Amino acid sequence: MQRSPLEKASVVSKLFFSWTRPILRKGYRQRLELSDIYQIPSADSADNLSEKLEREWDRELASKKNPKLINALRRCFFWRFMFYGIFLYLGEVTKAVQPLLLGRIIASYDPDNKEERSIAIYLGIGLCLLFIVRTLLLHPAIFGLHHIGMQMRIAMFSLIYKKTLKLSSRVLDKISIGQLVSLLSNNLNKFDEGLALAHFVWIAPLQVALLMGLIWELLQASAFCGLGFLIVLALFQAGLGRMMMKYRDQRAGKISERLVITSEMIENIQSVKAYCWEEAMEKMIENLRQTELKLTRKAAYVRYFNSSAFFFSGFFVVFLSVLPYALIKGIVLRKIFTTISFCIVLRMAVTRQFPWAVQTWYDSLGAINKIQDFLQKQEYKTLEYNLTTTEVVMENVTAFWEEGFGELFEKAKQNNNNRKTSNGDDSLFFSNFSLLGTPVLKDINFKIERGQLLAVAGSTGAGKTSLLMMIMGELEPSEGKIKHSGRISFCSQFSWIMPGTIKENIIFGVSYDEYRYRSVIKACQLEEDISKFAEKDNIVLGEGGITLSGGQRARISLARAVYKDADLYLLDSPFGYLDVLTEKEIFESCICKLMANKTRILVTSKMEHLKKADKILILHEGSSYFYGTFSELQNLRPDFSSKLMGCDSFDQFSAERRNSILTETLRRFSLEGDAPVSWTETKKQSFKQTGEFGEKRKNSILNPINSIRKFSIVPKTPLQMNGIEEDSDEPLERRLSLVPDSEQGEAILPHISVISTGPTLQARRRQSVLNLMTHSINQGQSIHRKTTASTRKVSLAPQANLTELDIYSRRLSQETGLEISEEINEEDLKECFFDDMESIPAVTTWNTYLRYITVHKSLIFVLIWCLVIFLAEVAASLVVLWLLGNTPLQDKGNSTHSRNNSYAVIITSTSSYYVFYIYVGVADTLLAMGFFRGLPLVHTLITVSKILHHKMLHSVLQAPMSTLNTLKAGGILNRFSKDIAILDDLLPLTIFDFIQLLLIVIGAIAVVAVLQPYIFVATVPVIVAFIMLRAYFLQTSQQLKQLESEGRSPIFTHLVTSLKGLWTLRAFGRQPYFETLFHKALNLHTANWFLYLSTLRWFQMRIEMIFVMFFIAVTFISILTTGEGEGRIGIILTLAMNIMSTLQWAVNSSIDVDSLMRSVSRVFKFIDMPTEGKPTKSTKPYKNGQLSKVMIIENSHVKKDDIWPSGGQMTVKDLSAKYTEGGNAILENISFSISPGQRVGLLGRTGSGKSTLLSALLRLLNTEGEIQIDGVSWDSITLQQWRKAFGVIPQKVFIFSGTFRKNLDPYEQWSDQEIWKVADEVGLRSVIEQFPGKLDFVLVDGGCVLSHGHKQLMCLARSVLSKAKILLLDEPSAHLDPVTYQIIRRTLKQAFADCTVILCEHRIEAMLECQQFLVIEENKVRQYDSIQKLLNERSLFRQAISPSDRVKLFPHRNSSKGKSQPQIAALKEETEEEVQDTRL
């Protein structure tokens, strides 16, 4: 960054903001970069501001029982705030004085006051000086208040972040990431620009009192008629505001539904295309959009009338003020024009300034109170440690994550045990964790000496992580004692990578020791990985380490923990993402050798680790199931250990699979069972349909108290994203950082908010910060958005001046129309993270405007209609001017004096009432035309938004995956949320305001030109100057806003990153370092924002200066060239004041339109995306309520045979595939043939291309070559018809928000009887029947109430309903329990007995059922043969599979000679037989 010119700027340069000229000049000539931005003044640095506020807040905490944050803010900023407030008041006072001078100038042209004609020139000078003084007072005052607001925001930003790092885990479990981000964005943003409004809470009443006194002098008691009307108008607008809020709240739910479906569609676009659901999803979203638009129109109409009421209230205010006085005493024109000027200022004070000031104080105090409550939350308390101790001891320790929930948990458990019925499923496999109670540890006792290894095992949710958290102090024990030295190192179950180099992530602030560093790198098997990078360990890792694989991230996290020299190492499942060989090597070299003399607590479910541990602690439901050595485990729990040991392949299973087996074993041999139970009996009981699970599931949904989730770290299924291989391990951070979780309202809420709507009961969950830290969220997590129309805070009144525009309307371009709730503004959340679609030109092109206007043909006619109405209004204005200036009337009190044609006095004789009738009639006509002129325009612009949304949705659904792969999900969702909200809410009224302001300016100039042609000559160069100044400023301002948006992203990214690694930060004591990084991010954003505010003030002040020069010219031209007659000079000066203030407003409004039109540009960019495959001849799947043929098949063979494919024979010739056009081939020359009904297994190492081949068969990639199914080539039929030939069970399960019926049959092709039949076949009937509404039960949140196994069965049911002849399965058994796995195997044998099956699977027992195997190595087919030939050790088969697969496939070669076959096979067969009599 460059050194700021502000530091050396003179007082004059600071006053006129001339120091910003270099950046404006550079931005106009070239594109600005971050290096061009000026450094911030030291007074604005986050370090200084946070230290200042933190000192005052600590003082407040120490001195009072009820500390108030506002007191700390007052001591920091109050006097500067009041200083600028006084300047603002003085500037407002000048606005009240100006009409007095205007009245004196008009009076000097009265024929009876010729003696005052000589002082008219001096009055004109005084009037011009008032404009100059107002300019010099208001702009520095407004900028100073904005500056103070910015400093307050920065200080509170830092205070909140520091507090976040200190919060206890219990508090973090109650606060969502959405609430935290909202606290930093939505609430604190109120201070930046709203602070200038705060002073009007006292300025406006003083101004009203002053104005009423001046108007009283002119009109006496009739002045209160106008004031009364303004008060009624304010109340009327408040009523409209409440009506608008009602429509907004109704509309919010509809927008939320649409965005939920849209976000799920975007996240699972590959599955949507694989299922051929594009048209079903489009129809579903468009139906929701139709309902939403009905409420959008109602809200827009109310906002329009609210805005129009202000526009046209000026006439009534003047008319009601003048009429009573005129009827009684008569009135001169001087009083009319003076009253007009007074009423303009009065109207702004009563209907705008004061209500907005009250609202600003209300919002600001509410935000301060929320922040104050947050700053007083319970903090993390480190346990009292004994630095001299060498052992780790726990004595009778009991703990709850929810304070005070112990008794509630026991009561809820007892209640549910009393309500057991016989209609449910007791299998724990389907829930993965208990749905009851809080995570709890009960009566834990153990003692480990220095240098010992304690292995902690247990089923999912048993309390293993909670145990480590209690040792770290994150979880406070409610009973018992904990003893250790306090020097702890920690490795989280889910690897956390901070932005920085690999070396920085491992050292993590600890002093560098070369020998220790190299030893750790070697022990953690990172040497080979680091050597592959050109920068070695100095390579910079992105957010969350997205450039690394899951295994690399896990090893770096482990290396970080090992590198720190500590007394106690807490390792929470560090091997989750490692293959068998790497895991074994790291355990031996690192855990057992390098750390041999250290005390270690290792959470693991691997039998090999239990054997080598000094002590073993097995947890079950929070209690100690066993504590002792491995030999004691074998002696005391022979059944437990023998069952695990009997599975020779147990150690080779994935962590999830081991957890599943361990869970079931623990259940069968729980301490609760007093009597011995045989294996067979226990197994049968475990699969018996008792109804306990069903009742628990219902209670967990229907009863919020029973739905307190159990804290457990549930490993996520590796995501398959955009056709990448199955272990691509799409990092969770990429989704969470872009789309923060939504949350309703208050800081502390129940864990589940339940919305029950009869049969369509919906259970919605949120993601707390603690969930974010543990990543224990549902895979199908969707984005809940509650979108509402933004309330127009600004009505662009033509009478308003520059200052009013600046204070009240600059926020226009930042208003969003998006909210999740009153607490969380979704637009603020979205703007917290930089949008990669912002790579559009800085200024909207004319082509965008032309395309926008021609989207809907009616828009052109509506614009013509607006022009016709405008011409009629100009004619009406000329009639009014004729009445005011050219009607010969007589004064009631001076009827004896003769007058010429320019008599300026109106009398109230009976004959003269007709003048008022004409005036009122013309004004009413003008008012009516004005009220309804913009209504067709607003209506049509909303229709344009509807059309653009439809086109964009269709374009995204039809776009090829190669295009969608290059876009972030958050960026796509921004178009459907942020940009569509702008098109719906902001753009229509902003365009209407701009057109109206522009036409008003043109009309007023035309009137003035008729009255005084010389003024028209002066107007032309002023308009040219405005246009040039706008173009000059716009280039720089848009770029600065872009840089500011980019600078905002690191702040919130750093917040999310810190929260994810908070336990690690605390364990390593790195909070100060991360506070420093946060302050750097704040300073970067401040530099951009401060420069934007400064350049904006430069622009506003230059506009004001041009206006002042113009008004000086108009004043002196009028005084010097106008003859006798008050009417002419009064009209000229009054219109001149309004012309220029309106022209300023029009210029600024055009900038707002340009800014909002960037959203239109982004929408057009999506509409112009390429379309995949051949266009279909029929794009409407529904006709007259019935499903029509979606695709017209062009192949003659298919036309003759309605049932295609009939056999399922597939021939692949020279198939090659690429992710993007021009990219590297990821599959090369793949050729093979499959006979009808044959099963083919795909084998190969991770990353060899197995899942990619399945995507290529579905034509989801850029492919070359030929594929034929039953003799029909894929080039001869349409794309969707080709995909309908396949049934798909993807690795990433897709459950969208909707009913069971919609999820199974989105096109509504099948009857309920057929759906229930398929549900019976796949074992889903009992699952569906336990929910209210059954098939009509609404699934939300990615089907959060279903287990992963249930979701896989849903996918299986879809394939059965599709009646496809070719089935593609991509890891269907990943993370499945044995029961669901056996159901899928059974269904495949029965329902797909005659189908061709292509299976990508890691479970060997499933692969052995295939007749042929396709071995893929290095993106090519290495072998395609039967299993008998592949078993030959000299074949390429053994080279193509991983070592772990080799162990599974050849168990007899890897076991001892006397060892029998794995008992897991027997278990599999017994389970399969049992399943025949068990419905799930």
Swiss-Prot record:
User: Which PROSITE patterns did the record assign?
Assistant: ABC_TM1F (PS50929), ABC_TRANSPORTER_1 (PS00211), ABC_TRANSPORTER_2 (PS50893)
Enzymatic class: isomerase
Query: So where does ATP 2 get bound?
Result: Y1219, G1244, R1245, T1246, G1247, S1248, G1249, K1250, S1251
Question: What GO molecular function annotations does the UniProt record carry, in alphabetical order?
Answer: ABC-type transporter activity; ATP binding; ATP hydrolysis activity; bicarbonate transmembrane transporter activity; chloride channel activity; chloride channel inhibitor activity; chloride transmembrane transporter activity; intracellularly ATP-gated chloride channel activity
Q: Which residues carry this modification: Phosphoserine?
A: S549, S660, S670, S686, S700, S712, S737, S753, S768, S790, S795, S813, S1444, S1456
Q: Name one GO biological process term.
A: membrane hyperpolarization
Q: Where are the transmembrane segments?
A: 78-98, 123-146, 196-216, 223-243, 299-319, 340-358, 859-879, 919-939, 991-1011, 1014-1034, 1096-1116, 1131-1151
What keywords appear on the UniProt entry? ATP-binding, Cell membrane, Chloride, Chloride channel, Endoplasmic reticulum, Endosome, Glycoprotein, Ion channel, Ion transport, Isomerase, Isopeptide bond, Lipoprotein, Membrane, Nucleotide-binding, Nucleus, Palmitate, Phosphoprotein, Repeat, Transmembrane, Transmembrane helix, Transport, Ubl conjugation
Which Gene Ontology CC terms are recorded? apical plasma membrane; chloride channel complex; cytosol; early endosome; early endosome membrane; endoplasmic reticulum membrane; membrane; nucleus
Supply the domain comment. Binds and hydrolyzes ATP via the two cytoplasmic ABC transporter nucleotide-binding domains. The two ATP-binding domains interact with each other, forming a head-to-tail dimer. Normal ATPase activity requires interaction between the two domains. The first ABC transporter nucleotide-binding domain has no ATPase activity by itself. The PDZ-binding motif mediates interactions with GOPC and with the SLC4A7, NHERF1/EBP50 complex.
- Similarity remark: Belongs to the ABC transporter superfamily. ABCC family. CFTR transporter (TC 3.A.1.202) subfamily.
Q: How does it assemble?
A: Monomer; does not require oligomerization for channel activity. May form oligomers in the membrane. Interacts with SLC26A3, SLC26A6 and NHERF1. Interacts with SHANK2. Interacts with MYO6. Interacts (via C-terminus) with GOPC (via PDZ domain); this promotes CFTR internalization and thereby decreases channel activity. Interacts with SLC4A7 through NHERF1. Found in a complex with MYO5B and RAB11A. Interacts with ANO1. Interacts with SLC26A8. Interacts with AHCYL1; the interaction increases CFTR activity. Interacts with CSE1L.
- The molecule here is called Cystic fibrosis transmembrane conductance regulator
The top of its lineage is:
Eukaryota, Metazoa, Chordata, Craniata, Vertebrata
